[in-house]
């Protein structure tokens, strides 16, 4: 282990030496750039662009381009990047993460690689965690970029598609991670290419990269459509039942945060809902409602996991930032169960139309880099999942902050009593204090205690994050006391007021350890910026979540034996033990994220295939007849091959029914037309007849443009419907394969195999539906509407297909379970009308 650590440290030192040499080359251009007039300096941008177009690489332009930005920043912003900032910029250009401490000027560091990569004309995305930071950085740094001749855009959620498109067309685009993700998904749902807003993803520079790529890695971005099924009554019934339970009626696993009914709970459910057997297959839906009601009532906590807004809405609280996540909802019915629990209006369940995780969104960029003050603890994850290295950059001035050993108390009450006493003492001498909490509930509790102690203070949490920047900016003033949840105010520097340095600088107090060391380090890093003095102190209790999860029982005995109910234990060994517990949790979390990625990679591969083919259809300025005719041919082959083992007369009858109800006019084909033909000849005969019907359908359309429009909307409509159903099916499969792990099967392998089979079935189903709609649509000659922005075009109105129905005289007992259902759904018989047999 010691050798591994030594190797890592040596590698880092070697990297720093290499970066210092590269930074020196940038500095050699300093005098040359200083001698240029403003116009000459601005002209460098045009020169660099021409050199790039003529074959020079961005790497070869780096030294000169960085020197131009340094000089430009000095003239426009009054800031001159230090050597360590130039080093950080080089790391960013190479697609890695420079670990730079709080206050080291990450925003200015980013200007150099952003400028250099924008010269390619392919677009640079600067990604921030919230819109306030996007607007702030775009306004401040945009002044420099514009002066140097580059265009800057800001992409906000409130902007129209046209405004978004303009923002993405700029050389540099500032946006939040979620908005880039949603724009990507929406672009892959439009019917016309001109309605897409993004260009191909080129280079992303992610601010607070650990927050987005690690903490939110598992968060799927979901575009949903409402599901019409009215289920609010079931949510209320399940909630009423769950609230009637005693503690013995359910079992909670604290470590994994799971819950289930005990035998007595099952008996009560069967009595309450008047059932013979709760776990009968007919009650699968009901058990889902009960499971969600259990989680909502006994796992999800008000003011910790969520808050109830004044508008009677349930808002999720981000566990890492302490902010409410506007517009986000728990999926799979959990959000509705919480709404029932809190007695607020239940919103309709939604159906997923498109989804992607941040892991797969950001892996689609040609080059990805990011900035953070605390990335080294997650280096393995950055390297394995994103192929990014984390390189620690030295501080411009030595860090002077004093990090005290943790103080451990027996109870939460005695811990908070000590916190309030410490805050009061520091307030009285004028030293500013920042108190970091894990939950909204904790910050409210401490606030009440400080009010009682007569200590004026500000509270920054999910309930008032709109004042965030203002509160944080004042947190370093003499006598300021600020309570903040976790990461609130990240990205805004706390600058020390007059006379504060002499009092020891800003003191950061942590009220408990987070399960991630990185989050604790981020809290500590709010103090001691740019060589300022500062202090940090964590207060823990045996009743904290992290301590309960990892061995507080042994320590509890020590407190009881020594009769130390109000006193604290302080030791470096204790701090190391806590950090060891955190490492275990981090390891578990990493494993979970890695497994999520393995599952999501199945979806990613399938999504890329669908989106690529969809893009090809949208951008096609050609007749799509060859594609549609190929679909008709493959559908015919599937139907004929699907009945290959049936008796001859049964086979012919099934094929004839398919042809009548899905392919040809009903009275245009009889059994005699197919009798005596081989399977190959049947396929050819039906295909030739189908081509005539196709030509007849197309001839009803007014002109070539109308044909193209009809073909596009026909294909896109079918693909989007089937893809939406497929996403839901994959979600259900993922839940189901987890159970197969108990049968010694690898759930991921099972999911990959089953997901691949389902995808192939979906492709078959898409081709079946396109065939049926193309051949059976009632096409009317109509004028094309002028309003281009409406997706409801002539073509969508023209598709008024006959709903293929099951012939009344058909003997269903003769149809094989794995054959295609003759109703024309495109599903296998066992999954369609065969379910009723």
UniProtKB/Swiss-Prot annotation:
Subunit note: Monomer and homodimer. Part of the essential Sec protein translocation apparatus which comprises SecA, SecYEG and auxiliary proteins SecDF. Other proteins may also be involved.
One GO process term, biological-process aspect: intracellular protein transmembrane transport
GO cellular component terms given for this protein: cell envelope Sec protein transport complex; cytosol; plasma membrane
Chief location category: membrane
Topology relative to the membrane: Peripheral membrane protein
Family: Belongs to the SecA family.
Residues the record lists as binding ATP: 85, 103-107, 493
PROSITE patterns: SECA (PS01312), SECA_MOTOR_DEAD (PS51196)
Stated name of the protein: Protein translocase subunit SecA
HAMAP family: SecA
Organism of provenance: Streptococcus pneumoniae (strain P1031)
Gene Ontology molecular-function annotations: ATP binding; metal ion binding; protein-exporting ATPase activity
Enzyme Commission number(s) from the entry: 7.4.2.8
CDD domains per UniProt: DEXDc_SecA (cd17928), SF2_C_secA (cd18803)
Recorded catalytic activity of this chain's protein: ATP + H2O + cellular proteinSide 1 = ADP + phosphate + cellular proteinSide 2
């Amino acid at each position: 282990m010691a050798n591994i650590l030594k190797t890592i440290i040596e590698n880092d030192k070697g990297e720093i030496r290499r970066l210092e040499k590269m930074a020196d080359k940038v500095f050699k251009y300093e005098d040359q750039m200083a001698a240029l007039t403003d116009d000459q300096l601005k002209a460098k941008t045009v020169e660099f662009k021409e050199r790039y177009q003529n074959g020079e690489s961005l790497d070869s332009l780096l030294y000169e381009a960085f020197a131009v930005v340094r000089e430009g920043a000095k003239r426009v912003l009054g800031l001159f990047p230090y050597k360590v900032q130039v080093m950080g910029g080089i790391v960013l250009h190479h697609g890695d993460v420079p670990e730079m401490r709080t206050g080291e000027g990450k925003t200015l560091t980013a200007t150099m690689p952003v400028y250099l990569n924008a010269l390619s004309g392919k677009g640079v995305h600067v990604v921030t965690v919230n819109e306030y930071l996007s607007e702030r950085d775009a306004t401040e740094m945009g002044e420099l970029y514009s002066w140097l001749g580059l265009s800057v855009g800001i992409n906000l959620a409130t902007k129209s598609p046209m405004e978004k498109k303009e923002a993405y067309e700029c050389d540099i685009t500032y946006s939040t991670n979620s908005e880039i993700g949603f724009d990507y998904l929406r672009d892959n749902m439009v019917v016309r290419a001109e309605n897409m807003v993004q260009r191909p993803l080129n280079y992303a520079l992610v601010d607070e990269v650990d927050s987005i790529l690690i903490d939110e890695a598992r968060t799927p971005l979901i575009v949903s459509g409402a599901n019409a099924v009215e289920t609010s009554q079931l949510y209320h019934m399940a909630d009423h039942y769950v609230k009637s339970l005693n503690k013995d009626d359910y079992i909670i696993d604290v470590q994994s945060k799971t819950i289930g009914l005990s035998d007595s709970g099952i008996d009560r459910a069967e009595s309450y809902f008047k059932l013979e057997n709760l776990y009968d297959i007919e009650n699968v839906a009901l058990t889902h409602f009960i499971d969600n009601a259990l989680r909502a009532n006994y796992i999800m906590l008000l003011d910790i996991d969520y808050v109830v807004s004044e508008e009677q809405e349930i808002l999720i609280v981000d566990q890492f930032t302490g902010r409410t996540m506007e517009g986000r909802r728990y999926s799979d019915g959990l959000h509705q169960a919480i709404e029932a629990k809190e007695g607020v209006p239940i919103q309709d369940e939604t159906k997923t139309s498109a989804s992607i995780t941040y892991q797969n969104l950001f892996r689609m960029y040609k080059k990805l880099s990011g900035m953070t003050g605390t990335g080294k603890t997650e280096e393995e994850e950055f390297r394995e999942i994103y192929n990014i290295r984390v390189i620690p950059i030295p501080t411009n001035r030595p860090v002077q902050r004093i990090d005290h050993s943790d103080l451990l108390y027996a109870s939460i009450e005695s811990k908070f009593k000590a916190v309030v006493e410490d805050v009061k003492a520091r307030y009285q001498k004028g030293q500013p204090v920042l108190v970091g909490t894990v939950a909204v509930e904790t910050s409210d509790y401490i606030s009440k205690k400080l009010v009682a102690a007569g200590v004026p203070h500000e509270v920054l949490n999910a309930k008032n994050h709109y004042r965030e920047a203002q509160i944080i900016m004042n947190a370093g003033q003499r006598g300021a006391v600020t309570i903040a949840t976790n990461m609130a105010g990240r990205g805004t520097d706390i600058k020390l007021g007059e006379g504060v340095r002499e009092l020891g600088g800003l003191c950061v107090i942590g009220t408990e350890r987070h399960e991630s060391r990185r989050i604790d380090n981020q809290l500590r890093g709010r103090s001691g910026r740019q060589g300022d003095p500062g202090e940090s102190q964590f207060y823990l209790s045996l009743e904290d979540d992290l301590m309960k999860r990892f061995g507080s029982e042994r320590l509890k005995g020590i407190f009881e034996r020594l009769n130390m109910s109000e006193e604290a234990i302080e030791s470096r060994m204790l701090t190391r033990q806590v950090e060891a517990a955190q490492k275990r949790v981090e390891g578990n979390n990493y494993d979970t994220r890695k497994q999520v990625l393995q599952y999501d990679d199945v979806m990613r591969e399938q999504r890329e295939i669908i989106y690529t083919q969809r893009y090809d259809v949208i951008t096609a300025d050609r007749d799509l007849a060859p594609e549609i005719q190929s679909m008709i041919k493959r559908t015919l082959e599937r139907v004929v091959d699907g009945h290959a083992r049936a008796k001859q007369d049964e086979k012919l009858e099934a094929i004839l029914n398919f042809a009548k109800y899905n392919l040809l006019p009903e009275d245009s084909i009889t059994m005699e037309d197919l009798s005596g033909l081989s399977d190959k000849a049947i396929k050819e005969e039906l295909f030739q007849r189908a081509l005539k019907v196709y030509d007849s359908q197309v001839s009803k359309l007014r002109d070539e443009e109308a044909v193209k429009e009809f073909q596009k909307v026909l294909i896109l409509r079918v693909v989007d419907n089937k893809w939406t159903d497929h996403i839901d099916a994959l979600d259900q499969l993922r839940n189901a394969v987890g159970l197969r792990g108990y049968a010694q099967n690898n759930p991921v392998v099972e999911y990959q195999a089953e997901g691949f089979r389902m995808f192939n079935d979906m492709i078959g189903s898409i081709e079946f539906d396109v065939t049926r709609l193309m051949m059976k649509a009632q096409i009317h000659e109509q004028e094309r509407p002028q309003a281009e922005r409406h997706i409801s075009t002539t073509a969508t109105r023209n598709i008024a297909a006959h709903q293929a129905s099951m012939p009344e005289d058909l003997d269903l007992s003769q149809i094989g379970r794995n054959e295609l259902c003759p109703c024309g759904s495109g599903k296998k018989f066992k999954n369609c009308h065969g379910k009723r047999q």
